[in-house]
From Swiss-Prot:
This is Ferredoxin/F(420)H(2)-dependent CoB-CoM heterodisulfide reductase subunit C. Keywords: 4Fe-4S, Cytoplasm, Iron, Iron-sulfur, Metal-binding, Methanogenesis, Oxidoreductase, Repeat. PROSITE patterns: 4FE4S_FER_1, 4FE4S_FER_2. Residues 10-40, 51-82 form the 4Fe-4S ferredoxin-type domain. It comes from Methanosarcina acetivorans (strain ATCC 35395 / DSM 2834 / JCM 12185 / C2A). Binds 2 [4Fe-4S] cluster. Its main location: cytoplasm. It catalyses: coenzyme B + coenzyme M + 2 oxidized [2Fe-2S]-[ferredoxin] = coenzyme M-coenzyme B heterodisulfide + 2 reduced [2Fe-2S]-[ferredoxin] + 2 H(+); coenzyme B + 2 oxidized coenzyme F420-(gamma-L-Glu)(n) + coenzyme M + 2 reduced [2Fe-2S]-[ferredoxin] + 4 H(+) = coenzyme M-coenzyme B heterodisulfide + 2 reduced coenzyme F420-(gamma-L-Glu)(n) + 2 oxidized [2Fe-2S]-[ferredoxin].
Amino acid sequence: MSEELLKLLKAEGLDLLSCMHCGICTGSCPSGRHTGLNTRRIIRDARKNRAAVLSDYDLWLCTTCYTCQERCPRGIPITDAILELRRLAVREGLMLPEHRFVSEMVLECGHAVPLDEETKKKREELGLDPIPETVQKDPEALEGLKTLLKTCKFDELVAKK
């Protein structure tokens, strides 16, 4: 068992040891119908193998709809546990490349989707301001956001480790 991981989760009020592996979580998961997400396996792996669960791609397939958590006969906060596992994974530098890219874009330009010249042109053709009312339009706000993200150490969190 991954005692350290279980202690971390339990400290957050997420006790996974009462799971009886009935599979209701997996059977009721809307995301699992279309992806490889198997919540029961994630819970099992969290109990057995820290490295495996934190580096599992499927950990990121959960849409956080809370269906599994609402239907769990033992009342295990499964979705909350998955969110905490994700937080732990990110702290260890384990992040999907797509998430890292979006995070880097936010750090760089204050927005997950940067504006390119083509998008600005299309906006103008539609009668819109080429730059929407976001921090991208206000250099002072952008600098404020960057300062906030650095103060929160978001830049360190998303840096490749």
